[in-house]
Regions:
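Nucleotide-sugar donor-binding catalytic core of glycosyltransferases
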Residues: 2-34, 39-248, 255, 259-277
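Conserved acidic donor-binding segment of nucleotide-sugar-dependent glycosyltransferases
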Residues: 281-283
Length: 283
């Protein structure tokens, strides 16, 4: 039996990263893998919340992450379970550490793009182009984790399939936050302006259509019960990107027998990957 220690698995963002594996631990045991929090193990897994801090400078975050890893004995791997293809913060720690692998939920299918300068949805450490010019030196040890944000959301939840033949009141569901009622900040940076800017064109297009559209009234939230009532009653579920490319709505559309429309996912490399344009969603 191979034992894998989950370091600081109760820390919020670490818990999200480890959650799919914890829920599958009985299956993992069947193939000879045991998860543990004890001191006897073959490999240690270190998730991103233990080695990055978005509230300080990138340099300070990397230094703190490397200091944390100095206390790890034996072989270890780094897991970056964030819902973005960006490697900023974890990559810098990984390449200066003794980690065997960097496991990532999703990566750019064209790995050469990491060397060209992209922000990839993360600007906690500045808004300039983020280039990994030495990426090729480490790319063979940067691999997919076998999980992604869909697995995190649905870990331990039994999928319920609804009656597809039931009448649907709405043509399109646009039940996403817009506009923001109050400014939203994360790590001292405003997020709501970013969201509103790219969601406004979507709402503008929908408002011009002569269809019955389920949406929020001036961004005012509704109860969970009302939210799912409208979602289930929609023929089409429109799902713009959020912090990353995947969201619970992606699977809920299939559960509710609705057509999923979202931005193109063909540039994403992830596993499992249910996104097949023209079959499981429409780009």
């Amino acid at each position: 039996m191979i034992k894998i220690k989950l370091y600081e698995h109760d820390v919020h963002r670490n818990e999200c990263t480890f959650r799919p594996y914890v829920w599958a631990q009985n299956v993992l045991k069947d193939v000879g893998i045991e998860l543990t929090d004890g001191d006897s193990y073959d490999y240690a897994w270190i998730a991103q919340a233990s080695i990055i801090n978005k509230k300080v400078s990138l340099g300070e975050s990397v230094a703190n992450g490397l200091e944390f890893l100095q206390n790890i004995s034996g072989d270890y791997m780094i897991l970056d379970g964030q819902d973005s293809t960006s490697l900023i913060g974890t990559y810098e720690v990984f390449k200066e550490s003794n980690a065997l692998l960097l496991l990532k939920n999703s990566l750019l299918k064209d790995r050469s793009l990491y060397k060209q300068g992209l922000q990839l949805g993360r600007y906690y450490w500045g808004e300039g182009d983020y280039k990994l010019e030495d990426f090729d030196q480490y790319s063979d040890r940067i691999v997919l984790s076998g999980t992604n944000w869909l697995a995190t959301h649905w870990a331990g939840i039994k999928v319920q399939w609804f009656d597809y033949s039931r009448p649907k009141e709405y043509d399109v569901s646009a039940m996403f936050q817009y506009p923001s009622l109050t400014p939203s900040y994360e790590h001292g940076l405003i997020q709501s302006d970013y969201y509103d800017k790219f969601r406004k064109p979507s709402i503008d297009i929908l408002n011009k259509m002569k269809y019955n559209i389920a949406k929020l009234d001036q961004g005012k939230r509704v109860s969970s019960e009302e939210y799912y009532k409208r979602l289930i009653s929609s023929k089409i579920i429109f799902a713009p990107f959020g912090y990353g490319e995947m969201a619970p709505r992606d699977l809920e559309a299939a559960m509710f027998g609705s057509i999923l429309i979202k931005p193109d996912m063909s540039y994403i490399d992830t596993s499992p990957n249910p996104f097949i344009d023209g079959e499981t969603y429409i780009a």
